[in-house]
Amino acid sequence: MTRSLKKGPFIANHLLKKVHILNLEAQKKVILTWSRGSTIIPSMIGHTIAIHNGREHIPIFITDQMVGHKLGEFSATRTFRGHAKNDKKSRR
């Protein structure tokens, strides 16, 4: 179920403050965040946000095509190691 339009998008307060301060100072710094559920808004365009995936922070450069998506969509939490080539035990 999607979020109601009258509520607006969810953005963590600390992340919104950091982006706002960097926009006022016209600086480009990497912003560390653990808030994977925050929605990308137009004021974040051009910034690099390092999103935590459970083990490390992955830096993501925000572009205009990412607006409306969640930050967590751009940092995978699981590493796929590939399927087993000749695993005869699992066939039985």
Curated annotation (Swiss-Prot):
Cellular location(s): Plastid, Chloroplast
Pfam families: Ribosomal_S19
Gene Ontology BP term (one): ribosomal small subunit assembly
PROSITE patterns: RIBOSOMAL_S19 (PS00323)
Classification via InterPro entries: Ribosomal_uS19, Ribosomal_uS19_bac-type, Ribosomal_uS19_CS, Ribosomal_uS19_SF
Lineage: superkingdom: Eukaryota
GO function term, MF aspect, one: rRNA binding
GO cellular component: chloroplast; mitochondrial small ribosomal subunit
Chief place where the protein resides: plastid
Keyword list, A-Z: Chloroplast, Plastid, Ribonucleoprotein, Ribosomal protein, RNA-binding, rRNA-binding
Protein family membership: Belongs to the universal ribosomal protein uS19 family.
The protein's role, per its UniProt record: Protein S19 forms a complex with S13 that binds strongly to the 16S ribosomal RNA.
Name of the molecule in the record: Small ribosomal subunit protein uS19c
The species this protein was found in: Chara vulgaris
Lineage: Eukaryota, Viridiplantae, Streptophyta, Charophyceae, Charales
Name of the coding gene: rps19
